[in-house]
């Protein structure tokens, strides 16, 4: 009887440890916006929807997607920031246009961005806000 009790306790302990150690992200997604000529770009721009799905599945990083708008042309661009904690604080920032073309890249561990490219990406841009995040507690 004692042996069965100890085995049961052991199984309960292992299951509890595995379940409690599984990290699940807190996800924020603003589906109530229009950008790049489409309602809900997080779903209706295939490349952006793919980035969101990858972010939801990532186990070692956090993702923030911000929406910006050119104050002259009114075109939208997206700023994607990836933050990794497990190897120290590492971040990478990408800028994309509506079609998913990379316009800008910077971050720790990358070749420093060309200052002209960085300036051009942020020139005349108005920050409209965060539209998607994954955060781990």
Predicted regions and their residues:
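Extended hydrophobic/Leu-rich segments
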Residues: 6, 42-45, 77, 84, ...
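Short, non-transmembrane alpha-helical segments in secretory-pathway proteins
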Residues: 28-61
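Bacterial signal peptide processing site
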Residues: 22-24
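C-terminal motif of bacterial Sec signal peptides marking the signal peptidase cleavage site
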Residues: 18-20
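C-terminal partner/receptor-binding element of secreted or periplasmic proteins
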Residues: 106-137
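Mature extracytoplasmic domains of secretory-pathway proteins
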Residues: 49-100
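Bacterial N-terminal signal peptides that target proteins for export
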Residues: 1-9
């Amino acid at each position: 009887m004692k042996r069965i009790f100890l085995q049961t306790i052991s199984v309960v302990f292992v299951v509890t440890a595995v379940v409690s150690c599984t990290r699940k992200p807190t996800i924020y997604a603003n589906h109530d916006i229009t950008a790049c000529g489409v309602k809900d770009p997080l779903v209706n721009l295939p490349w952006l929807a793919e980035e969101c799905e990858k972010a939801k599945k990532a186990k070692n990083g956090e993702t923030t997607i911000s929406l910006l708008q050119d104050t002259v042309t009114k075109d939208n661009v997206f700023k994607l920031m990836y933050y990794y904690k497990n190897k120290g604080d590492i971040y990478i920032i990408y800028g994309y246009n509506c079609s998913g073309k990379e316009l800008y890249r910077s971050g720790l561990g990358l070749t420093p961005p060309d200052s002209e490219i960085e300036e051009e990406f942020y020139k005349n841009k108005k920050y409209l806000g965060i539209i998607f995040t994954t955060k781990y507690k």
